[in-house]
């Protein structure tokens, strides 16, 4: 089974869209969707519980330890699938790429598959220029400091074998830095991974509530 882990903060307007997209696109894959509320100031938690109350494969958790890192630690511990894919609640990443992730990690007997928006065959739509420049500077810096042949650490969208992530717990980063911590631990422990091109779309509704620190 595939566990899809989505941290949510102040995403009331996106929740219906999230559920709709997964229901439409993952009918042939046994999966669970784990929504972890991270100290939302709106009624995200209440709406998530209402939307998911009659859906057996949807789970809603409330993070008591504030921060994106705490939300992901909770979601990973609570997952039941053999594989865990982390996605952000804006669904900027393509669910069709999620299906490719799932096929590749099983077929090639991998421990992880990392997506990159910045390799051949990837497509990026409407990425704000300022954010794009900062992204490339940061990822280039990380690549050379840690001597890793990977250029998109800041993208959350990755899939892992569940036992790999659980063996690496706990993750200590409290903010967006966790998306650097997790793949670096996978690489440094010698786990087997591949990188594949992905499509990325700037979010359609609202603004991101998780900030890079």
Describe every region a protein language model picked out.
Residues 1-3, 32, 181:
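Cell-envelope/extracellular polymer assembly enzymes that use nucleotide-activated donors
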Residues 11-14, 40, 68, 94:
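Donor nucleotide-sugar binding loop of glycosyltransferases
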Residues 11-25:
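Short, well-formed alpha-helical segments that are part of the catalytic scaffolds
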Residues 37-46, 91:
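A conserved acidic beta->alpha catalytic loop
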Residues 63-78, 83-86, 95-176, 202-213:
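Acceptor/aglycone-binding surface of glycosyltransferases and processive sugar-polymer synthases
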Residues 148-149, 171-174, 183-201:
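Catalytic donor-sugar/metal-binding loop of nucleotide-sugar-dependent glycosyltransferases
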């Amino acid at each position: 089974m595939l566990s899809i882990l989505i941290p949510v903060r102040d995403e009331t307007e996106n929740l219906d869209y999230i559920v709709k997209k997964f229901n439409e696109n993952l009918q042939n894959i046994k999966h669970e969707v784990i929504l972890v509320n991270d100290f939302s100031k709106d009624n995200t938690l209440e709406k998530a519980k209402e939307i998911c109350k009659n859906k057996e494969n949807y789970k809603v958790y409330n993070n008591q330890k504030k921060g994106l890192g705490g939300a992901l630690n909770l979601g990973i511990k609570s997952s039941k699938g053999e594989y865990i894919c982390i996605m952000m609640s804006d669904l900027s990443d393509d669910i069709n790429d999620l299906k490719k992730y799932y096929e590749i990690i099983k077929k090639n007997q991998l421990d992880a598959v990392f997506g990159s928006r910045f390799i051949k065959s990837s497509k990026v739509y409407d990425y704000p220029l300022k954010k794009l420049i900062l992204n490339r500077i940061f990822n280039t810096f990380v690549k050379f400091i840690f001597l890793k042949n990977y250029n998109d650490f800041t993208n959350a969208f990755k899939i892992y074998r569940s036992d790999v992530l659980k063996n690496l717990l706990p993750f200590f980063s409290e903010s967006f830095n966790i998306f650097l911590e997790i793949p670096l631990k996978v690489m440094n422990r010698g786990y087997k991974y591949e990188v594949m091109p992905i499509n990325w779309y700037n979010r359609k509704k609202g603004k991101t509530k998780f900030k890079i620190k």
